[in-house]
Amino acid sequence: VDEAAPPAALKALALRLLETGLTISWWGNIRFEEAFSPDLARLLAASGCIALTAGLEAASDRLLERMKKGITVDQTARVAAAFHQAGILVHAYLMYGCPGETIADTVDSLERVRQLFANHLLQSAFWHKFTATAHSPIGLNPAAEGLTILGPTFEGFAENDLRHADPNATCPPWLGEGLRAALLNYMEQAGFDIPSQRWFSHRVKPPRVTKTWLTQALAASSDVPLTAERRCVWIGGRPVIAATGRTRTRVILPTRTEDFTISLASPHTEWLLRFLHESTPSLSRRNHAYPRLAEVRDRFPAAGARGFDRFSRGSAWQSMRQAGLLLV
């Protein structure tokens, strides 16, 4: 059983909450999947999501691959950044003492976690010692990792922790003590200037992770492509016609924190108002699909898809996106 909520399910939940106008605060448990785009993060936040928890585990690509987690550390950083930008708090489950993990791996992981906290991409975390579970890849095939399962017999979900022996383990008690001390400081936004290896009572080598790891990981992120099948959802306020001229109309797009003003040709204004109305969550939308981007392109006045492509590269479209037009 995987209790992590999939992106599609949370998207559906967020839309239903917005459609019904139900105002609640909620949080959930997820996997750091790249399907959690910046736009999806904004949708979740608009529906009342205030926090999410997820497993970063060993914070090492090599160990995440061995555990078959299906995520990378760079990917985790980008997803956490999307939630941070949307105002959603992130709690990470961390793990040390994994099969095959060296002390150098653990020090590297601490440096990555330090950078995530220092840049406010994590707000809280808990670092626990590895435990095999009954239906994890390691629990199902412990011999592949050199482990011996000592018991107990599996008794159902939430009763699935297994005791194990690992003759190759490199996990002395002082390692966990150092991790806990560092994490306590990081959660208080303190201790970032202390070198990672200084948290441990025994001598360890400096981390192999560069100080610019996070900057590089986030720089590798690209904007969500204008995929034709994405649905358009408007979470901004109702547009206001500010002024109408002979050929152009000034439209205000209100949000909770600021207003965005755009100037459009008159035919484009009519298209915009209809488009945003069709994209706004409401009770009347519950039985109707939100417009796909492909449909929006085809209905663009005058030049159709080609004209829309030019329009989407302009400042008006960018203001619409900032004001609450999501592609999810």
Language-model regions: role of each:
Residues D39-A41, G100-Q115:
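Catalytic cores of alpha/beta
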Residues R163-V328:
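Radical SAM enzyme core and accessory elements
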Residues V1-L89, C98:
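Conserved SAM/AdoMet-binding glycine-rich loop
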Residues S47, V79-V90, L116-L121, A181-D193:
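A structural motif corresponding to the C-terminal end of an alpha-helix
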Residues A8, R62, R66-M67, Y96-A104, ...:
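Flexible glycine/acidic-rich beta-alpha junction loops that bind and position SAM and/or redox cofactors
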Residues D2-P7, R31, F126-A134, F200-V204:
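A glycine-rich phosphate-binding loop feature that marks nucleotide/adenosyl-phosphate handling sites
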Residues S25, H91, H120-W127, P195:
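Acidic/polar loop patches that form or flank catalytic/metal-binding clefts of enzymes
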